[in-house]
Amino acid sequence: MELLGEYVGQDGQRQRLRVPCEAPGNADHFQGLLSGVARMKELVAELFGSPVQGEAQDRVAAAPEEALDGDDEDDAEDENNIDNRTNSDGPTAKRPKPPS
C-alpha cells in the first residue's frame, strides 16, 4: 500500500509525492497507513514550507491586525449579523410586563 500525491505549481510544474505504507514486521496495516500519512505530512510541509511561510509573513506585514485573527471574512459583516436570529418555535422569548 502507498500514498500518492501530486502538486501542480502556479507555473504548471508538476511534483509527485509517493510514500510507501509498509508496516515493519507483522504490524497492523492501519499502523502502516498511519506512519505513511505522517511521512506524507512531513513531505507536504517540506514542499510548502518556504512559500507558505513567506506568504504568511507578507499578510502580517500588509495588515497585522487582520492577519492575526485568522478570519478572512469582513469583521463589519460579522458585527451586522449578530442579532439576525430567528425563533421558529413560537413567539419571541420576551417576558410580558407585570400588571401595575
UniProtKB/Swiss-Prot annotation:
Pfam families: DUF4611. The modification N-acetylmethionine is found at residue 1. It comes from the Eukaryota. GO terms for biological process: tRNA threonylcarbamoyladenosine modification. Residues 66-81 have a biased composition (Acidic residues). It is found in: Nucleus. Its main location: nucleus. Residues 50-100 are annotated as: Disordered. GO terms for cellular component: cytosol; EKC/KEOPS complex; nucleolus; nucleoplasm; nucleus. The keyword Zinc-finger does not apply. Keywords: Acetylation, Nucleus. The keyword Aminoacyl-tRNA synthetase does not apply. Component of the EKC/KEOPS complex that is required for the formation of a threonylcarbamoyl group on adenosine at position 37 (t(6)A37) in tRNAs that read codons beginning with adenine. The complex is probably involved in the transfer of the threonylcarbamoyl moiety of threonylcarbamoyl-AMP (TC-AMP) to the N6 group of A37. GON7 plays a supporting role to the catalytic subunit OSGEP in the complex. Component of the EKC/KEOPS complex composed of at least GON7, TP53RK, TPRKB, OSGEP and LAGE3; the whole complex dimerizes. This is EKC/KEOPS complex subunit GON7. It comes from Sus scrofa (Pig).
